[in-house]
């Protein structure tokens, strides 16, 4: 039996380790990625564009790529169909992009085939398997165990060679507030993957779609794409920070403006709303939002919030922190003249 290979905490704390690299900067990491979408949505068009970009070292949507050899297993297509897509997407193609329309199954030699391919093309950066179902065999095993086992074989291969492997897969036709729950199969698939992508349209006939991205080394992102002339064009990209900011109530932005020329403000929630000229927000809601965003949005805008119960009612205290100009000055809270007794909420 092989002995466990362990690393102690001291070594991990001080020894420089190589961080995971990205084949497409900040989007596609080395390792295993699942790329999912409904049938005929245009997944193969996007995969082909990605393969062209990496094989030529040109940016994808203004994001740099790591140039290298690319293998695209188009297992639901023919060479004639691939040629037609190339005609539509490019005038020049790189000899570093390779295609195959047939392969072994995972259970009978696919990994060996990929290992042999890498011997011929050791500078490979990306392999796309389109689709997962074409390399799987029917199994009577537990569904989760089957999903996890199949995807782990591919992930282990990707990790051994420090390259990116993208497996194209489908989503279920179901409503769910979390798009990643729509990935067909069990959580054994998404749980094994280093990154998961879901391409989804609101309406089948629409030319726009959302690309949702999440992963271990990939922060959550949303891309708005438009399909035009057989190409997925980037309309808008939103990072996790930008998306979080969109959830901040508009009244808090107006509160920041309200406090811009004030060192402090003390009163009830009702008095605060009246002073701000707000008529659409009720006192209990503004109080909840002030507490919810006090350590994030309010703190980032150098506003300190305190809440207390007094004999004459509940009081809100707001104070602007020193150094509001961004000059790196003292960040200590400006003294609030009226004493308050903070309470735990």
Each predicted region: which residue ranges?
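Short acidic, hydrophobic short linear motifs in intrinsically disordered regions
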Residues: 264-275
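Conserved alpha/beta core segments of nucleic-acid transaction machinery
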Residues: 216-264
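Hydrophobic positions on the alpha1 helix immediately C-terminal to the Walker A/P-loop
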Residues: 46, 50
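Single conserved hydrophobic/aromatic residue that forms the stacking wall/gate
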Residues: 334-345
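Phosphate-binding/switch region of NTP-binding enzymes
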Residues: 34-36, 40, 44-45, 73, ...
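Terminal-proximal interaction/regulatory segments of ATP-powered molecular machines
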Residues: 274-333
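Conserved inter-motif catalytic segment of the P-loop NTP-binding fold
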Residues: 2-4, 10, 17-19, 23-24, ...
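Pre-Walker A (Motif I) flank of P-loop NTPase domains
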Residues: 29-33, 68
């Amino acid at each position: 039996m092989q002995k466990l290979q362990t690393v102690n905490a001291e070594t991990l704390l001080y020894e420089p380790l190589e961080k995971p690299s990205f084949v497409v900067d900040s989007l596609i990491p080395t390792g295993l990625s699942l790329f999912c979408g409904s049938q005929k949505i245009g997944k193969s068009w996007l995969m082909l564009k990605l393969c062209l970009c990496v094989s030529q070292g040109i940016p994808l949507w203004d994001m740099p790529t790591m140039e290298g050899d690319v293998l695209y297993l188009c297992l639901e297509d023919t060479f004639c169909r691939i040629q037609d897509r190339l005609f539509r997407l490019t005038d020049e193609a790189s000899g570093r992009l390779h295609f195959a329309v047939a392969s072994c199954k995972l259970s009978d030699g696919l990994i060996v085939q990929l290992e042999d391919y890498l011997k011929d093309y050791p500078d490979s950066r990306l392999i796309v398997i389109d689709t997962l179902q074409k390399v799987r065999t029917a199994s009577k095993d537990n569904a989760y165990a089957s999903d996890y086992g199949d995807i782990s074989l591919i992930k282990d291969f990707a990790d051994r060679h420090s390259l990116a492997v993208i497996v194209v897969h489908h989503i279920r036709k179901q409503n769910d507030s979390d798009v990643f729950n729509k990935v067909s199969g069990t959580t054994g698939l998404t749980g094994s993957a280093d990154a998961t992508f879901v391409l989804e349209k609101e309406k089948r006939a629409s030319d726009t779609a959302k690309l949702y991205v999440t992963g271990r080394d990939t922060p959550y992102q949303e891309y708005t794409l438009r399909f035009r002339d057989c190409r997925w064009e980037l309309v808008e990209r939103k990072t996790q920070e930008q998306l979080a900011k969109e959830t901040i109530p508009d009244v808090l932005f107006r509160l920041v403006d309200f406090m811009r020329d004030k060192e402090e403000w003390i009163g009830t929630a009702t008095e605060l709303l009246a002073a701000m000229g707000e008529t659409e927000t009720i006192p209990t809601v503004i109080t909840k939002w002030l507490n919810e965003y006090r350590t994030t949005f309010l703190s980032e805008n150098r506003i300190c919030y305190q809440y207390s119960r007094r004999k004459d009612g509940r009081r809100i205290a707001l104070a602007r922190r020193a150094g509001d100009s961004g000059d790196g000055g003292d960040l200590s809270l400006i003294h609030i003249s009226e004493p308050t007794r903070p309470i735990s909420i």
